[in-house]
A protein has these predicted regions:
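Oxidative protein folding and maturation machinery
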Residues: 1-160
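Short loop/turn microsegments at loop-to-beta-strand junctions
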Residues: 150, 172, 252-253
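Short acidic-hydrophobic, aromatic-tinged amphipathic segments that line or gate anion-handling sites
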Residues: 155, 232-236, 268
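Short active-site neighborhood of thiol/selenol oxidoreductases, capturing the structured segment around
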Residues: 162-191, 207-211
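Structural microenvironment flanking redox-active thiols in thiol-disulfide oxidoreductases
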Residues: 185-225, 239-243
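Short, internal strand/loop/helix patches
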Residues: 221-256, 260
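Non-catalytic, surface beta->alpha helical segment in thiol-disulfide oxidoreductase systems
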Residues: 251-254, 260-282
């Protein structure tokens, strides 16, 4: 074990001069970012100004490279960190904080999946320590970008019912929300004020399904007037989404953009990201 704490900075790798495009340099930096860190030295966990800030910068770089490179970079990092369990657990806690926490502006499920996959294969964790990552990995796989969204039944205020799969439109915008929540109201406002979204709805290119997943029906009914009349506004009468863990409800509101076959195009997106996608594709 290394006793003397001499850590003051994170030494980044020197990028070879022959790599002269932004893409090449970002790719190299992502793959070799942690090469100069000796993860056998647990003193790194006591220096958030070095290690945590280094992690934040690393995640920023991963946004600039292909998904396959980001996946390799994260898994390589965690393999390197297996030299010292304290360092390993510290890095996975940073992944929880920045990539998984619903309040993190850097939240990124695809990157977090890479971390979870590494944890599940790691010899440094025992079976008990793998229970939580296994459950999170299972939930993350549901409604993942590129997969088909899970079907469910919704109920309207008049008692009529429908299913997600029965909605016919080039695009479906699924908006899971709670009535009266501030972030939900902000999202409703942003979608209502978007000319792109409004026009797409008017032209029947997009159907919006607003879904309330909880049990306080009186509260939901009280806020029905908050929603545009051309949205489908339903609730989950039998609480199937919650009980069967069909959708990840830790972050409310949640927006999913689906294609005509209900394949997920955008997951946990912002109203701005939805608008931008529709502008480019409609």
């Amino acid at each position: 074990m290394i006793e003397t704490d001499t850590i003051t900075t994170l030494t980044l790798p020197t990028i070879p001069v022959m790599l002269n495009t932004t893409e090449q340099r970002a790719d190299y930096l992502a793959r070799h970012y942690w090469d100069n860190v000796n993860f056998a030295d647990s003193n790194y966990i006591h220096h958030p100004e070095v290690t945590e800030q280094g992690w934040v910068n690393f995640i920023d770089i991963l946004q600039l490279v292909p998904a396959s490179t980001a996946d390799i970079a994260l898994k390589t990092l965690l393999t390197q960190a297996e030299k010292e369990k304290k360092c390993y657990m510290y890095l996975t806690s940073l992944a929880d904080k920045y990539l998984y926490d619903p309040n993190s502006p850097m939240r990124n499920e695809e990157l977090y999946i890479s971390v979870l996959d590494a944890m599940l294969k790691s010899p440094i964790l025992d079976d008990t320590e793998k229970i939580r990552p296994k459950a999170r990995r299972s939930l993350a796989q549901k409604n993942r970008i590129g997969t088909k969204a899970l079907d469910f039944t919704y109920t309207l205020a008049n008692g009529k019912q429908g299913t997600l799969y029965a909605l016919k439109a080039p695009y479906t915008l699924l908006f899971i929300n709670n009535p009266g929540c501030h972030a939900c109201n902000e999202t409703i406002k942003a979608l209502k004020q978007s000319p792109t979204v409004s026009q797409a709805i008017a032209q029947h290119k997009v159907k919006v399904l607003s879904l309330y997943p909880d049990i306080d029906l009186a509260e939901w009914q009280k806020h029905l007037s908050d929603f545009p009349s051309d949205w489908i506004n339903g609730y989950d009468k039998k609480q199937m989404i919650d009980q069967k863990n069909l959708y990840d409800l830790k972050a409310i509101p949640t927006l999913y953009l689906l294609d005509k076959d209900k394949t997920v195009l955008l997951k946990d997106a912002t109203a701005e990201e939805i608008e931008e996608y529709l502008q480019k594709n409609i």
